[in-house]
Amino acid sequence: MSWSRHKSLQRIRSFRASAPAAAINLSNFDLSYMTARATTIQARRKAGGKSEPLIFDVPPDSAVLVEGVHVYIQLLDFASAMTERERETEASHRRVLSMLHLNYAACDQVAEEFEAQRVDFHGARMHAVIVSPPGPGNERDRAERALAFADAAKRAIEEVGRTTENGRYSTRVRVGIDSGSAVAVNSGTQDEREPLFLGAPANYAAKLAEGDEEGVFMSNRIRKDLGLPQLSSFDTLAAERASRTSSVGETGLSANTSFQSKRLSDAAIMTAASRARNSFILNVGTDANFSFHRHTPPLSTIDFALLTPSNSVRMGLMSIFGDIDGFTKYVDECIAAQRIGEMVSNLHVIRSELAATLSQDFLGRKVRFIGDCIHGLLATGTSYETDASGSVVASVKAAGGMRSSFELCQEELGGIENLGIAIGLEYGETPITRIGIRGDRSVRCSVSRAVSRSEELQGGCTGDQTALGPTALGHAPTSIRRLFAGGVAMGLDAGSVDEHLGSPPIVRSGEVSAAAAPYDSGE
């Protein structure tokens, strides 16, 4: 397993040729677009097909510019559900997967009531966007619908948690809401056809959803759209994150008959919760129906289409998060300068090359793209056990390869010279499965402390840093630990990893020094 500049360059040029900037088909989500899509969806349903969201199955060489309201729903008690007496066990992983399946179903039930576009489920987070009614002049209507949707989703999750298995899956809920322009693009994952939305409002809504206090938290842009007083502070985001909204008690909302008419009644919430519970019983039943097996490495051979709750993987592995640092700002610049084709083409190439580096060069498995971030898994070992130390070494090499591939993309592509890639790595027992709506709208799911920690580590890195988590450091050979002073390595690319692992350290004792034996992956 190794990175090759020649192979990477060939792939990058091939990916760019498949979706050149000049050939990107850009659409605007306006009334004509929505009407055409609604007609297509209705015709497919009459022919026996399934219903689809208004924006769906966007081709890799296309993009849709959307004015919408972005809603991030965070399950606050997700982390505690993942452990049992401070330890991750098969039982605790079954419980947290059941919890996610149940709450994903509740969110989907409510989303249908508001024509909310489900974007992504990722661990404890759901991202949805309200895109209709489209066009300027409808900002208030979209904001009212988004707030009513957020209120309904929170209540439905609380209701289904309260009434299922004596509250075993109950959780507090926090929701962040923001509005603005974003670009809908292909998800990059063949079996998940909902598009990803790139741009500031999705990012900002996610930040508003961060925190320990439950409730619904709006940006000043949403407050403005709703005609509510905006918050004034030196730190606007902090003020918004501390200002919980009451859908029924807040001045300006309780008397807003248009908004109140959009809120779901208690009876409708109970119906949505009941349908989610029935879906859970049909597809999962109980925790015990999540059945785990090991997958013999390499993980690149995992077929997500074959995974179900009763056919799930669980094993020790490395979780890898790679995030394109500075990309949201780049998206906003491209929207403002009408360079969306450039951005979509560049993203297609970068994501494709990062995924190819992980899976082809280092035999890892991509789970999904989350905006401009890639989540992957990697392990070495046998059908009986994971080689933890070998997995750490392989993932560090993969991280180095991903950075080298990204830097090669910067050489080949225009406009991305100011971007970087932040990478987080951690080791732990981790389940891998598909949950949610059965069929082509089920979602890939891999959750564990290692997954959460690797994402946190990536979030704390700058665009030239790679971070290795404490569990991975504990399994790492000395040669790897030397690379990560304080758990973080700067500018760690394929060349520097290979050079370091191939060069013996100097061992000193008193006045005597000597070269230690070189690292041997078989030791």
Swiss-Prot record:
Primary localisation category: cytoplasm
Gene3D superfamilies, A to Z: Nucleotide cyclase
Highest taxon, organism lineage: Bacteria
EC number, as in UniProt: 4.6.1.26
GO biological process: cyclic nucleotide biosynthetic process; defense response to virus; intracellular signal transduction
Domain Guanylate cyclase: from-to ranges: 69-209, 318-438
Keyword hit for Manganese: yes
Alphabetical keyword list: Antiviral defense, Cytoplasm, Lyase, Manganese, Metal-binding, Nucleotide-binding, Repeat
Reaction catalyzed: UTP = 3',5'-cyclic UMP + diphosphate
InterPro entries on file: A/G_cyclase, Nucleotide_cyclase
Residues that coordinate or bind a ribonucleoside 5'-triphosphate: Y72, R125
Record: residues binding Mn(2+) 2: D323, I324, D372
GO cellular component, one term: cytoplasm
Localization annotation: Cytoplasm
Binding-site list for Mn(2+) 1: D323, D372
GO terms for MF: adenylate cyclase activity; metal ion binding; nucleotide binding
Cofactor section: Mn(2+)
Record note on quaternary structure: Monomer.
Family affiliation: Belongs to the adenylyl cyclase class-4/guanylyl cyclase family. Pyrimidine cyclase subfamily.
Record remark on domains: The 2 guanylate cyclase domains fold into a pseudo-dimeric structure.
Function: Pycsar (pyrimidine cyclase system for antiphage resistance) provides immunity against bacteriophage. The pyrimidine cyclase (PycC) synthesizes cyclic nucleotides in response to infection; these serve as specific second messenger signals. The signals activate the nearby effector, leading to bacterial cell death and abortive phage infection. A clade A Pycsar system.
Protein name: Uridylate cyclase
Provenance organism: Rhizobium sp. (strain PP-F2F-G36)
